Amino acid sequence: MKIKIAVFPGSFDPLTLGHISIIEAGLKLFDKIIVAIGSNEQKKNMFPLSEREKMIQLNFKDNKKISIKSYKGLTVDFCERENAKHIIRGIRNSNDFNYEQSIAFMNYRLNDKIQTCFLPSTQEYAFISSSIVKEILLNKDTIDKLQLKKKLKPFLSRDVLNQII
């Protein structure tokens, strides 16, 4: 039987509870998920690639169905190299859907053998955004450590919190 491989691409800067929730939902649908950390020259990342890889490893260290890889270039080309037929995208709201749908259409035009699967965020995590986390972290010098952890706790796993604070 052929295994179903999916790619969950993103910058994961940092990895949030929202990302973790989408990965866990994807594990119910696919035999293997490649968490693919994309390199986007237009984005300035707060955390270096090695730290983002470590965040993912810490959260999924015991799960053999998950692998972590970094890549450059088009996501559909990466999927083809990895024999993945599916791209997972998390959807928090209609704005996410409209944006992700246009990307999915483009990807389909580039490679019609790769399907994008939209996984809705749970209500619990629909408000989470890496941008909000980065905004809090940019102001960390004005917040004591205990308060900083308290502010970030709704967004990040314990492993990620301990790594970045």
How would you label these PLM feature ranges?
Residues M1-I165:
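Nucleotidyltransferase catalytic core that binds NTPs
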